[in-house]
């Protein structure tokens, strides 16, 4: 018989840096899940990734206090900031530019994020990433 799902917990955790402090500890603790077990499993799964890269993770909590987790690709904003070599986007997008990214860089990011994007093909995915760049105050150039 399948386990009864108690709920889902969505977190963004730096790769290789999961520890029981907030926000992970309280989120898992209120569901009665083993915090250290998640931290060890997550850190082992993200060991080969770039340390500190934010990884969205969805934890499925079951009624018997067990869990599973699924990792997604890092946010587009992380890749865009890295490509534009900036630390943050513009405070006034549309008015002040924070940097520039090329369409080729947007295409590269779209290829990496294709599994998590709601797009049918690479061209649509590239447009989604370019839109994210513009909303961050980055200029998209050819």
Curated annotation (Swiss-Prot):
GO terms for biological process: translation. One or more lysine residues are methylated. InterPro entries: Ribosomal_uL11 (IPR000911), Ribosomal_uL11_bac-typ (IPR006519), Ribosomal_uL11_C (IPR020783), Ribosomal_uL11_C_sf (IPR036769), Ribosomal_uL11_CS (IPR020785), Ribosomal_uL11_N (IPR020784), Ribosomal_uL11_N_sf (IPR036796). It holds the Pfam family Ribosomal_L11_N. Keywords: Methylation, Ribonucleoprotein, Ribosomal protein, RNA-binding, rRNA-binding. Belongs to the universal ribosomal protein uL11 family. Part of the ribosomal stalk of the 50S ribosomal subunit. Interacts with L10 and the large rRNA to form the base of the stalk. L10 forms an elongated spine to which L12 dimers bind in a sequential fashion forming a multimeric L10(L12)X complex. This is Large ribosomal subunit protein uL11. It comes from Parvibaculum lavamentivorans (strain DS-1 / DSM 13023 / NCIMB 13966). The lineage of its organism: Bacteria, Pseudomonadati, Pseudomonadota, Alphaproteobacteria, Hyphomicrobiales. The gene is rplK.
């Amino acid at each position: 018989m399948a386990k009864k799902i108690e709920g889902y917990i969505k977190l963004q955790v730096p790769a290789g840096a999961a520890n029981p402090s907030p926000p992970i500890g309280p989120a898992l603790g209120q569901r009665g899940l083993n915090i250290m077990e998640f931290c060890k499993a997550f850190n082992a799964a993200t060991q080969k990734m770039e340390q500190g890269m934010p990884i969205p993770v969805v934890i499925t909590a079951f009624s018997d206090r067990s869990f599973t987790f699924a990792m997604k690709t890092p946010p587009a904003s992380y890749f865009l900031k890295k490509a534009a070599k900036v630390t943050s986007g513009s405070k006034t997008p549309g008015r002040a530019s924070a940097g520039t990214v090329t369409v080729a860089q947007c295409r590269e990011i779209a290829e990496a994020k294709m599994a998590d994007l709601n797009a049918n093909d690479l061209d649509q995915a590239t447009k989604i990433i370019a839109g994210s760049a513009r909303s961050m105050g980055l200029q998209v150039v050819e």
